[in-house]
């Protein structure tokens, strides 16, 4: 509840400062950043509330600012909070009381209660506050002669620009940043094609990257697919850049099918993004084939592509000199393979069916796979060796073919070829392997064998993680939205997560495996592949690692590029310096991951409610420094929110703080504010004087308002449970009394339900009194102050601010909660009387409709049946738990929940 308070403060704070908004996420969100200014106002409903909120907001602006910031050039006048009016003074004076009674109540709810009280005050009583306000305003204007009454926007003069501009700058940045990358050949030619540039991740909030990824995945899949084909040379650079940046690029490009070969270096994540986007784009030609082929095949292909890409990346990086030639050759191979792959996929599936049954053959096949890998490695080597001229030609071919979705896979397959060295690829991607082999070097039969083996492996892997199949299917169902989801998940699981949080990938493994077979292998490939392989291939790994070394150059480089693949090459081989840091953590993580992955994959065919990557991305961002942990803010808010109790408020009234504390901000915040304000507000003296006077203002006890409520038909909300309860009864005051005391009884049951604090006898006694002596308010008993987390937890017993007012509206304190109580009242009224009063039942039931109907005419309109049902269920539980004697006549009748403190105001 205090959250709303906090939000307002932060938002305005962000406005005011532009420097340290409390909730940075708002700043990062491109849309929210602009709307920040509007939020606080949207929430204000009443004028009084608006005034209070404005004051609070204004206070918040300055309070949280660092002293240094507060002392900048701007005159204090611009920062000065507008002087409080009489009502605000009243609120400031009494908010602590409300807080005492309703520790869980948010600031707005408290203000509503205060507004009720204020309305009840006699003009004489109000006069003191009015005078004080006038005095203060005069003094304030003297102290701040240049002060101008701002429009209701609450924003200090400089506020909007700082928050918004940084964002604009960031966005303006992007086009250049991509060009800055030293992408020797294609990058420059192709970069201009990019639809948009990514902001430099170092200067950009992590969340914005996600947003961008989503936007671009949704908005520019086709255009970007064609546009972006970063060069191979570019990819190494990309790799050097943070994975986050790569991710951003990936999302921006929404990867182009051909891009994979070049981008493979960028990162598995990048590849994955490409794959997912390409799948969505492929929608036309290949998707059909792929869907037909089977989720498995697609999955394998994607995995292979991603892993192959990774491996290629490493290899390409290692042999940068020959990189262009190799890749291009690979690309040529890709196109050829693309056709082959389509053919082979069907054959592979048939064979898959044959081999799927025997997982036993996997071990043997693993050996075969090794051989195949070696062959493939040889092929790859050959490809690398090929002339750069060919390479140049091939890129052109690739570009030509890039238009065809088929080639996105073929491209990935090319990549995979070099990547094949790692068993993971084989395991994960039966098809990919086939693709990997050069059509020229490997005969189709060989490919088929490999495919069979891979299929078996896949099956094996799928046995472990059946979700894979489903995942693939999901991809085949490809939609832009899904691709976006994949991208984001990829990010969460991605290289980036891998680099930063070894753990993140684990968490993410399940989701990735769940929907994104490609992701499974592609980004987490480092980890996920590893995990799969570890399980599947650890048996084989011992052999494989040994044998894979012959192709060591490739396998090792691949393993280096894919830390997650450590099991194969990495275990035995040193990592490249850049990746050294990552792999060490990965192996350990990968192992736990193995079990996690499989477990998750089994459970998570499609991502149900279970989230394996809870906060992984967030953690990654935080660990990277892209995000500031929100925990500090939350904790601060909680700490302060709990402190809204009287002690804090009253203690805090001292000095200038009163001006800022009005909002009922928690004590800790108040103290900070005091210190800061002391330092920077020239009007400190004014505040001090005002503080003294302010403290001299009368502080009326809630009981006072209760009495007034009784005498005045106007609804008065009590702060105490008792007072609030009494106000509840008082809502109906005079007019309802005519309805009979039954009305009280009908209401009381529900009220009892809401106020559970008091002993059962008390309510009964009070009810009797109320009936007999309708006009005597019950003394309000203050709740004991809550400590620690209790302050933050809503207790059913504490929902005392949900009181129906004389007009039958729930008093505003609770907001929507109030409305529910009304419904609860309506529902419970009939039930309670029927259930608990034998003879009086008929009366109460008759009366209830009256009371509830008049009191809550529109309640039903506000709530859905489901909500009502929920309320009813809760009430039933309460009834079962507590029964208090209340009678229509004042005789004890069983009422649910003793704590009904009804000061018989409802007459």
Curated annotation (Swiss-Prot):
Which species is listed as the source?
Answer: Mus musculus (Mouse)
Protein known as: HMG box transcription factor BBX
Query: Cellular location of this protein?
Result: Nucleus
DNA-binding region residue numbers: 80-148
What Pfam families is this protein classified in? Answer: DUF2028 (PF09667), HMG_box (PF00505)
From start to end residue, where is composition biased (Basic residues)? 447-457, 790-801
CDD domains recorded: HMG-box_HBP2
Keyword Phosphoprotein attached = yes
Q: What does this protein do?
A: Transcription factor that is necessary for cell cycle progression from G1 to S phase.
For this protein, the record's SUPFAM superfamilies field holds: HMG-box (SSF47095)
Give residue spans, biased composition: Polar residues.
Answer: 152-164, 656-668, 772-783
Q: Out of the domains of life, which is the source?
A: Eukaryota
What Gene Ontology cellular-component terms does the record carry? nucleus
Q: Which residues carry this modification: Phosphoserine?
A: 242, 476, 483, 701, 789, 811
Q: Which GO terms describe its biological process?
A: bone development
Task: Give the sites of the cross-link named Glycyl lysine isopeptide (Lys-Gly) (interchain with G-Cter in SUMO2).
Answer: 384, 571, 693
**UniProt KW Ligase keyword:** no
Phylogenetic lineage = Eukaryota, Metazoa, Chordata, Craniata, Vertebrata
- Annotated Low complexity bias: 723-732
Where in this protein does the record put region Disordered? 1-24, 37-80, 152-185, 220-242, 435-483, 495-612, 628-672, 708-736, 769-854, 877-907
Recorded GO molecular functions are: sequence-specific double-stranded DNA binding
The biased composition feature labelled Basic and acidic residues covers 1-19, 496-506, 534-550, 591-612
The record's keywords, sorted A to Z, are: DNA-binding, Isopeptide bond, Nucleus, Phosphoprotein, Transcription, Transcription regulation, Ubl conjugation
Composition-biased stretches (Acidic residues): 39-52, 61-75
């Amino acid at each position: 509840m205090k959250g709303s308070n906090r939000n307002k403060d932060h938002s305005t704070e962000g406005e005011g400062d532009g420097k340290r908004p409390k909730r940075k996420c708002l700043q990062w969100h491109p849309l929210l950043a602009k709307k920040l200014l509007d939020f606080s106002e949207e929430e204000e409903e009443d004028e009084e509330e608006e005034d209070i909120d404005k004051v609070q907001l204004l206070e918040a602006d300055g309070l949280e600012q660092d002293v240094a910031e507060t002392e900048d050039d701007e005159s204090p006048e611009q920062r000065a909070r507008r002087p409080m009016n009489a009502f605000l003074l009243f609120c400031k004076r009494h908010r602590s009381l409300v807080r005492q009674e309703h520790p869980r109540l948010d600031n707005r709810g408290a203000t509503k209660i205060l507004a009720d009280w204020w309305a009840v005050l006699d003009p004489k009583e109000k006069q003191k506050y009015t005078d004080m306000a006038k005095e203060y305003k005069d003094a304030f204007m003297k102290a701040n002669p240049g002060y101008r009454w701002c429009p209701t926007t609450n924003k200090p003069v400089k506020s909007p620009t700082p928050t918004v501009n940084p964002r604009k700058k960031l966005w303006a940045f992007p086009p250049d940043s991509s060009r800055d990358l030293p992408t020797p050949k294609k990058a420059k030619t192709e970069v201009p094609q990019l639809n948009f540039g990514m902001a430099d991740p170092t200067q950009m909030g992590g969340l914005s990257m996600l947003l961008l990824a989503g936007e671009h995945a949704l908005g520019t899949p086709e255009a970007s697919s064609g546009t972006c084909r970063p060069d191979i040379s570019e990819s190494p650079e990309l790799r050097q850049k943070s994975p986050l940046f790569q991710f951003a690029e990936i999302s921006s490009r929404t990867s182009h099918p051909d891009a994979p070969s070049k981008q493979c270096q960028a990162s598995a994540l990048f590849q994955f993004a490409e794959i997912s986007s390409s799948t969505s784009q492929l929608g036309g030609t290949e998707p059909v084939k792929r869907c037909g082929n089977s989720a498995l095949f697609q999955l394998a292909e994607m995995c292979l592509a991603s892993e192959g890409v990774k491996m290629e990346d490493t290899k390409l990086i290692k042999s940068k000199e020959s990189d262009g030639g190799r890749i291009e050759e690979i690309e040529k191979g890709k196109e050829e393979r693309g056709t082959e792959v389509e053919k082979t996929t069907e054959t592979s599936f048939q064979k898959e069916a044959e081999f799927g049954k025997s997982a036993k053959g996997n071990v043997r096949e693993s050996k075969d796979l090794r051989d195949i890998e070696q062959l493939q490695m040889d092929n790859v080597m050959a490809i690398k060796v090929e002339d750069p001229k060919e390479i140049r030609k091939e890129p052109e071919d690739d570009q030509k073919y890039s238009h065809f979705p088929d080639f996105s896979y073929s491209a990935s397959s090319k990549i995979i070829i070099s990547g094949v060295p790692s068993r993971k690829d084989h395991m994960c991607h039966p098809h990919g392997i086939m693709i990997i082999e050069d059509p020229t070097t490997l005969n189709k039969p060989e490919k088929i064998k490999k495919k069979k083996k891979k299929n078996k492996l896949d099956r094996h892997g799928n046995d472990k993680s059946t979700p894979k199949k489903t995942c693939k299917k999901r991809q085949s169902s490809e939609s832009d939205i899904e691709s976006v989801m994949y991208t984001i998940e990829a990010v969460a699981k991605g290289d980036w997560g891998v680099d930063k949080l070894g753990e993140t990938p684990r968490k993410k493994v399940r989701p990735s495996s769940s929907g994104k077979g490609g992701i499974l292998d592609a980004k987490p490939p480092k980890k996920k592949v590893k995990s799969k392989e570890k399980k599947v291939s650890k048996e084989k790994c011992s052999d494989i690692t040994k044998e894979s070394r012959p192709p060591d150059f490739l396998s090792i480089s691949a393993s280096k590029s894919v830390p997650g693949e450590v099991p194969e090459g990495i275990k035995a081989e040193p990592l490249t310096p850049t990746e050294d840091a990552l792999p060490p953590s990965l192996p350990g993580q990968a192992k736990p991951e193995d079990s996690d992955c499989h477990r998750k994959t089994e459970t998570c065919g499609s991502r149900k409610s279970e989230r394996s990557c809870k906060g992984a991305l967030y953690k990654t961002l935080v660990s990277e420094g892209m995000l500031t942990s929100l925990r500090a803010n939350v904790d601060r808010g909680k700490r302060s929110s709990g402190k809204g109790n009287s002690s804090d408020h009253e203690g805090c009234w001292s000095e200038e703080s009163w001006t800022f504390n009005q909002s009922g901000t928690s004590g800790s915040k108040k103290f900070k504010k005091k210190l800061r304000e002391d330092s920077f507000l020239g009007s400190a003296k004014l505040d001090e004087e005002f503080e003294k006077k302010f403290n001299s203002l009368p502080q009326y006890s809630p009981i006072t308002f209760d009495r007034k409520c009784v005498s005045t038909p106007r609804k008065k909300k009590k702060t105490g449970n008792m007072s609030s309860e009494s106000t509840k009864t008082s809502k109906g005051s005079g007019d309802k009394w005519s309805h009979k005391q039954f009305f009280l009884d009908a209401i009381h049951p529900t009220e009892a339900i809401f106020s559970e604090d008091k002993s059962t006898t008390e309510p009964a006694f009070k009810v009797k009194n109320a009936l007999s002596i309708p006009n005597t308010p019950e003394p309000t008993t203050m709740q004991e102050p809550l400590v620690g987390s209790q302050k933050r937890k809503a207790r059913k017993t504490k929902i005392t601010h949900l009181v129906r007012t004389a007009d039958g509206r729930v008093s505003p304190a609770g907001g929507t909660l109030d409305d529910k109580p009304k419904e609860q009242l309506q529902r419970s009224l009939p039930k309670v009387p029927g259930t608990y009063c034998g003879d009086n039942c008929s009366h109460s039931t008759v009366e209830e409709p009256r009371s509830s109907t008049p009191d809550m005419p529109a309640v039903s309109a506000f709530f859905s049946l489901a909500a009502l049902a929920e309320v009813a269920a809760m009430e039933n539980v309460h009834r079962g738990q507590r029964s208090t004697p209340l009678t229509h006549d004042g005789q004890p009748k069983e009422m649910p929940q003793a704590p009904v403190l009804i000061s018989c105001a409802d007459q």
